[in-house]
């Protein structure tokens, strides 16, 4: 599939080495946000045979990292909590309710008073967690359910311990299980579609040998999950991400609006880019199946940039 889209799948580009057991993996979903049809889906690298049959796009649940800032914190804050992109939060030392400090990804200390727009553009952890704390994790969780996520945990007991995703770490994608690229992409497609969520579709209809329709999947299954004005504001802020923020590597055109959000989990176990143009929404996950961190060694094969490079290469090809 990658080769058909004009993207090389070789070890020189993406650091795969046949001498290593652990190999970096990737998954991608592309959807036409206007109707929900999935136009491309990649579940992993290489020919899908033997041990390569796992479809990571639909079956692998991974931490969404900072891609959840927009969905869990900022979307509900703008949509129903009376906040705007100009609402400010202080990027200063801040602890979760349990006392653990919230850490920013950047190592240059804190950046003081910043609006939500800047919090999105620069992917500021403390700003996102503070926003979710104000609007409450319960509201953020409810919005995520409305965005179509099915792998979230409301409350679950495991070996005598209680697990729940209704907490402050939700803002940074800190989940009990994780999400699939398939569902994450559908949520971002809702923003691209001016707040209307379309249940993603992998087929239009199924017919028998005589042409009789057995399954009809052409009827839209859609709902308004955020206001059009909220979608417009989020899109505007995420355009800044691509123009001058954490997603500049994804920019492939100066004539077409491109919006999106980067995402990394702790220790770079999961690296994402979810974004859209006026035509398609695409989400890319990269990481290792055994959950080791992606390499942060700079150079031609800088692994933590692969998700953005794949996104740009494929989206440029299809536009």
Identify the meaning behind each predicted range.
Residues 24-26, 49-71, 86-89, 169, ...:
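Short active-site loop at a secondary-structure junction
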Residues 100-105, 136-185:
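Mid-domain, small-residue-enriched loop/turn segments at the edges of structured enzyme/sensor domains
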Residues 82-140, 167, 209-240:
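Conserved catalytic neighborhood of penicillin-recognizing serine enzymes
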Residues 35-36, 62-89, 119, 187-191, ...:
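Active-site SXXK
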Residues 38-52, 144-164, 283-287:
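Active-site-adjacent bridging/hinge elements
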Residues 20, 27-31, 35, 60-66, ...:
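Secondary-structure capping and boundary motifs in well-ordered enzyme cores
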Residues 1-20, 24-32, 40-42, 47-60, ...:
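A penicillin-recognizing enzyme superfamily signal
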Residues 80-84, 96, 135, 139, ...:
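A generic secondary-structure signal for well-formed alpha-helical elements
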